[in-house]
């Protein structure tokens, strides 16, 4: 009886496959013949393990640089996962509150992993080795992570990413180029003495400005902040859950993540009242602390007091250590 049921199940599956292949002008028999000769899939081929493990190429012989480059590659893979969820949220693929909440919670888990694992960079690098190999990486910088810049642009209105000094200069209808030139992180990538663009910023603009302009235009009206209003209804419990999740995402991206970098910078770049500059020439003491930038993706979800004190207590706690 079991064999008969299995045969019926196989017949049904073959019929479904035949229909699928017919719709695309393909012959199922040809593909079945190919399966006869194909090898079974294995783990190392599926994840392209050999290729993956060949991508870590330190620039020096200092052992801890391997940790440094590997961790940054892991970070970019997590950013890819965040963007994967965010694309579904902003492209109309999510149409109910429960799914919207699920996607936000997924992104929070990715950021939670990033923030909690940053001790690999803070505590897990030999300070003397780091001081040496970092000089071989100039002028590259984590500042140049385009995936993180895209996460920001997909999360909120571009006006919320403008440097505080320029907020009053811009109006909603201004061209994307006007906004791009005044984003907070561009101000943080200028020489602290001359005010000129660092080579780090020049390289980044040359490679990615066109892409970022496209993202600004594409997500003006469908970024995550715009999408969230479809699901905020005071009468539904899911609305309060979504608010909690979005606030958590805001904190991860704009407080905990930059301050994890700030803490690492304090540990590795400050000693005996002497402060070293970042490899990219960025002013990390002004660029990283949220209390200076006050970048908030969802300002309407925070009280005035919370916004006024954005990231302050965390910074004070870390500087004391």
What are the functions of these language-model segments?
Residues 2-321:
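Surface-exposed peri-terminal alpha-helical interaction modules
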């Amino acid at each position: 009886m079991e064999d008969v049921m299995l045969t019926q199940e196989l017949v049904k599956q073959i019929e479904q496959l035949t229909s699928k292949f017919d719709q695309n002008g393909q012959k199922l028999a040809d593909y079945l013949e190919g399966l006869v000769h194909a090898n079974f899939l294995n783990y190392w081929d599926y994840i392209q393990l050999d290729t993956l493990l060949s991508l870590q190429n330190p620039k020096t012989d200092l052992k801890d640089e391997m940790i440094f480059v590997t961790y940054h590659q892991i970070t970019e893979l997590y950013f890819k996962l965040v963007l994967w969820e965010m694309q579904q949220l902003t492209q109309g693929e999510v149409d109910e509150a429960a799914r919207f909440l699920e996607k936000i919670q997924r992104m929070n888990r990715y950021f939670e992993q990033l923030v909690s694992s940053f001790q690999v960079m803070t505590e897990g690098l030999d300070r003397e080795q780091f001081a040496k190999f970092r000089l071989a990486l100039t002028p590259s910088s984590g500042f140049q992570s385009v995936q993180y810049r895209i996460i920001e642009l997909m999360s909120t209105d571009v006006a919320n990413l403008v440097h505080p000094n320029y907020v009053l200069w811009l109006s909603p209808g201004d061209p994307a180029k006007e906004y791009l030139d005044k984003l907070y992180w561009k101000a943080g990538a200028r020489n602290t003495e001359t005010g000129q663009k660092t080579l780090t910023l020049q390289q980044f603009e040359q490679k990615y400005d066109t892409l970022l302009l496209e993202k600004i235009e594409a997500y003006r009206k469908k970024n995550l902040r715009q999408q969230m209003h479809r699901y905020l209804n005071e009468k539904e419990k899911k609305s309060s859950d979504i608010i909690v999740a979005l606030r958590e995402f805001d904190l991860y991206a704009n407080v905990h993540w930059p301050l994890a970098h700030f803490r690492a910078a304090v540990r590795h770049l400050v000693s005996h009242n002497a402060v070293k500059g970042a490899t990219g020439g960025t002013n990390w003491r002004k660029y990283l602390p949220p209390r200076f930038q006050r970048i908030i993706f969802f300002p309407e979800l925070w009280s005035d007091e919370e916004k006024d004190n954005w990231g302050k207590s965390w910074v004070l706690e870390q500087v004391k250590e």
